[in-house]
Amino acid sequence: MKLLTALSELISIFLFTTIFIFLARKVAIKIGLVDKPNFRKRHQGVIPLVGGISVFAGICFMFGLSDYYIPHLSLYLICAGVLVFVGAMDDRFDISVKIRAVVQAVIAVVMMVIAKLHLGSLGYIFGPWELVLGPFGYFLTLFAVWAAINAFNMVDGIDGLLGGLSSVSFAAMGLILWFDGQTSLAMWCFAMIAAILPYIMLNLGILGRRYKVFMGDAGSTLIGFTVIWLLLETTQGKTHSISPVTALWIIAIPLMDMVAIMYRRLRKGMSPFSPDRQHIHHLVMRAGFTSRQAFVLITLAAAILAGVGVTAEYSHFVPEWVMLVLFLLAFFLYGYCIKRAWKVARFIKRVKRRLRRQRENRPNLTK
């Protein structure tokens, strides 16, 4: 595929999604598909929840525009469409967690039975021995689908963060697949980014605060499902493009945040799905950073971790078990910082004050 052709297609997807999201936000306001501020949501005014619907429209446009060969494409679009519809209904009418979990489980079963996408192996994470899962892989796949959807749902807490973290994941997968010759799958990843960018621009208020939109559960569900579909497509089989352990690095921040916060809630005797303000973005902002700064810092951290995974995938000299050990070390470091968040926040504030004093004193020294 010519690079110029690929670029023109991505620009077309971006422009289509931009136009669609502006039209969709008007419809959303009329039908009540909006997010209203409450004790946890501190935004001003009602915000249309059309980011996810627009991303899905952009992806449908991409597949209608091109002739890429994507295995079981029709099945993916049907499954994703169902999840987006249920997510939109949840955004509008607040569907119970149990109903959403059942729908996600049914979609996962359909994916495993018809598309044959499931975890059959976790690779060589124990040295020279491949960890083959057998029938247990189907149960683990069900959990993986649920985990991916909820991981990206949980990081959708401040402006731009879900879009930034998902773009990092899709970019990492896209680069690996592009250089591996999997052009169609790589373009799918890049198309996801092109469809997400208009949402990021409106969500951050780059085109004006009055055009602000949110992703909604429809969007976070779509992103999580697409990520796990692509990872199952590319990490399994005899000639897989991505090692299973690399998948952990590609979605590191959403995965770490979900596991850490659910563990903390369970230890307190709370439901793992109960809302709170203990996510990574809340803790970073508590350390004295603004919402925009937290978005940049967390996205940068995700890019670094994904970069480690991509580099190891290309280097081929770092064993998979070493990458697993390094990931677990990174996870425990993350957990340590989260568990002692107040100490970390106090340390960061102290450093920021010290740097501020140094900047203030510097002009006096030069006089």
Curated annotation (Swiss-Prot):
Keywords: Cell inner membrane, Cell membrane, Glycosyltransferase, Lipopolysaccharide biosynthesis, Magnesium, Manganese, Membrane, Transferase, Transmembrane, Transmembrane helix. Pathway: Bacterial outer membrane biogenesis; LPS O-antigen biosynthesis; Bacterial outer membrane biogenesis; enterobacterial common antigen biosynthesis. It catalyses: di-trans,octa-cis-undecaprenyl phosphate + UDP-N-acetyl-alpha-D-glucosamine = N-acetyl-alpha-D-glucosaminyl-di-trans,octa-cis-undecaprenyl diphosphate + UMP. The keyword RNA-binding does not apply. It is an enzyme of class 2 (transferase). Pfam families: Glycos_transf_4 (PF00953). GO terms for cellular component: Gram-negative-bacterium-type cell wall; plasma membrane. It is a multi-pass membrane protein. Inhibited by tunicamycin. CDD domains: GT_WecA_like. One of its GO terms (molecular function) is manganese ion binding. Its cofactor is Mg(2+); Mn(2+). Its EC number is 2.7.8.33. Coiled coil: none annotated. Its main location: membrane. InterPro entries: ECA_WecA-rel (IPR012750), Glycosyl_transferase_4 (IPR000715). One of its GO terms (biological process) is enterobacterial common antigen biosynthetic process. PANTHER family: PHOSPHO-N-ACETYLMURAMOYL-PENTAPEPTIDE-TRANSFERASE, UNDECAPRENYL-PHOSPHATE ALPHA-N-ACETYLGLUCOSAMINYL 1-PHOSPHATE TRANSFERASE. Belongs to the glycosyltransferase 4 family. WecA subfamily. This is Undecaprenyl-phosphate alpha-N-acetylglucosaminyl 1-phosphate transferase.
